[in-house]
Every structure is written in C-alpha cells, then in structure tokens.
Design a protein with these regions (language model features):
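A residue-level marker of the well-folded mature domains of exported/periplasmic proteins
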Residues: 24-360
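Gram-negative bacterial Sec-dependent N-terminal signal peptides
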Residues: 1-24
C-alpha cells in the first residue's frame, strides 16, 4: 500500500504540473479522482471515457488531469486537496466512499466546483452529486438471468452493503423471479470495489454452490474470466461492455455512460452557468445503457429483455412496482404501487425470497 501511495503521489505531481502549465492559456481544468485503474475494463474505465469525451468536446478550451487507484479515506482527501491547490476548476470524485472527503475539501476551496458520484451529501454550494439508476439495468439483466439459468441458481457479487448495491440485488432478483418462479439467488460480499483476486474468489464460491448465472457490482472483469473456466456458466458486463468475453460467458452488460454528464458540467464551468444539483438518470436519460445481447441468448428472451428496457426508458414501467414484500414477508408495496426515490435512496432491506442477511 505504501508503494502504491508513493507512486500515486508522484503521478499526481506530474499530472498537476501539466495542468498548471495550461493555466497561462486560461483553459478550464477538469480533474478526476478514480478509485481503480483506468484499465479495469469496468467502472473506472467508463469514467475515464467520460474524461476523454470532455477533451474531445472542448479541445483547447480545456485540460484534464486524473489520479487513479486512490483509496477511499485520508489518501483521497490529500489527492483532492492537491488538485484544488494545483488549479483544477472542477473535480469529479468517482466513488461513494469519497463522500466525506469531497465535502471536507470543498469547504476549504469555495471557488472550485466538486462533483461527487453516487453520493448524497452536498454540504456547501460548490458540491453537486450525480448517480445513475443502475437498478434499471439490473432489472433487464435479471430477466435474462432468470430465463437462462439451467440450475435455477443465480449469484450476485456485492461490493459493499450500501443502498445503491442493495437496489441492484433486489431489482435483479425481482425480475429473475418474474421470468422464472423457481429461481433462487445467493449473494457473496467482496467488500471491495476493485480487487480482481477477491472478485474471482467470489465468483468461484458461487459456481461451487451450483450457480450458473453470475451478476456483479464490482469493477473488474475477473468474475467473467472465472465464469469462462466453467462450461455453462454465464455473466454480464458490469459498468462497461466487457465485450471481450462475448458471446459467452458475457451475454449482455449494464453500461454506465458518464460522458454526456461530464461534457455538460464542464461546459457549465466554461460558460459560467454551473450550479449545484443532484442528478439521478437512468435508461431513459441515456446514463444507463444495455450492452448488446449476444447470440447465446435465445431470440425470444432477447426480445423480452429489449421490450423491458424500452418500457423502463419510456416510463411506462418502474422496476420497483408492487405487489412486493420485504424479506420478512411484510408488505412493502401494494399492487400497482411504485417505490419513491427516497425509499430507494435509503434501501437497506432485501425483498422476499432472497436468502441471507445484509451485513451490518
């Protein structure tokens, strides 16, 4: 960890020196803090695609800088502080665990704009938050999972037991169960966003339990690589398309498309219209996309999945529509009732049918 931190600090110094050199040209400086490597093929890769889109959109009006592999905690606060001191006009902090650090640093630098991904705290006027309705994409993946499983056992690799992740678990299970009433779900918690070894171990543990469809809310391609070792096991790209594993084991993907948001928000800094806001877009807004469904999926299942995605996109269907019960059997949503955003944002329970407890 010490070696990685030292390397990260050195790399940050180089990146910020580059951004500082651009200040004489009055370029807007957009900076990005990443929890994983840009080569992870998933979460961080997609955020970096957004950064590159900013460069493509604004050309010589903007300079970007980034730091990858920044641990959540004190290291993140140091990186954000250094970025602010080095002349960044807007800083995107791209992991839930950066929330407190983002707000702490923002309070010290009121002239710098901060954008925190997946969080909810906006303690000062220069902090905005943004997220994607990942649970919408999970509904589509869940439908495919329910139709494709032969063992009737699907598995889910969770990162941390926070509402965003629990939403995805519940949405996947609800729609797998609708597609296949006999399906069961096992959840394994990796307690990491990005750790290929731990993610592979989690996938292996699920496969050993007889799971033949794996979903994940972790950042690397390791679960798909593990699935590829066992004939008949399939999975889904997470955050990015992960098309290298198509047509199987990767049969589709939930793709996070951050580019339009990053281009919009940097543009607002450039033209002086930036204002604090909270954004939570989904399939309809283009922030959540469904990756190509491979030929390993039967045509009728593909058509059903595409129809489900379309109904979510146009607002005619909400993935959390009753009747739905909580895990303990108590009524959560009555027939036709739709979950409100406040409940979803604080979700801390499983729906009926999921076995196991949410870690505290």
């Amino acid at each position: 960890m010490l070696k990685r931190t030292l390397l990260a600090t050195a790399a940050l110094g180089l990146g910020m020196a580059f951004a500082g050199a651009a200040s004489a040209q009055d370029k807007t400086k957009a900076c990005f803090v990443y929890v994983g490597p840009i080569g992870d093929g998933g979460w961080t890769f997609q955020h970096d695609q957004g950064r590159l889109a900013v460069e493509a959109a604004y050309g010589d009006k903007v300079e970007t800088a980034f730091q990858e592999n920044v641990p959540e905690g004190a290291d993140a606060e140091r990186v954000m502080t250094q970025m602010a001191l080095s002349g960044c006009d807007i800083i995107f902090t791209t992991s839930f665990g950066y929330m407190d650090q983002t707000n702490a640093v923002a309070a010290k630098f009121p002239d710098v704009k901060f954008e925190h991904a997946t969080g909810y705290k906006r303690d000062t006027p220069n902090v905005s938050t943004y997220n994607a309705r990942f649970y919408e994409g999970r509904a589509v993946m869940g439908h495919i999972a329910g139709k494709m499983t032969k063992s009737n056992k699907i598995g889910y690799i969770g990162s941390f037991p926070i509402p965003e992740v629990i939403q995805g678990i519940n949405s996947s299970f609800i729609h797998a169960k609708k597609a296949n009433p006999n399906v069961t779900m096992s959840v394994v918690w990796a307690y990491t966003w990005f750790d290929p070894a731990k993610e592979a171990d989690a996938a292996k543990a699920l496969i050993e339990q007889g799971v033949d469809v794996i979903l994940q809310h972790t950042d690397s391609t390791a679960p798909l690589a593990e699935a590829a070792k066992t004939p008949g096991v399939i999975g889904f790209g997470q955050a990015s398309d992960m098309a290298a594993y198509s047509p199987s084991p990767r049969v589709s993907a939930i793709i996070d498309n951050w580019a339009p948001y990053y281009v919009e928000r940097v543009g607002a800094v450039i033209d002086g219209t930036w204002a604090q806001k909270d954004t939570w877009a989904g399939i309809g807004g283009g922030e959540v996309q469904i990756g190509a469904i491979s030929d390993a999926v039967p045509a009728d299942v593909k058509a059903e999945a595409e129809a489900l995605a379309a109904s979510i996109a146009d607002g005619s269907y909400h993935p959390f529509t009753g009747p739905l019960n909580k895990q303990d059997g108590s009524v959560w949503l009555k027939d036709g009732e739709v979950a409100d955003d406040g409940t979803l944002a604080g979700m801390g329970f499983y729906v009926e049918g999921i076995v196991g407890d949410i870690p505290k």
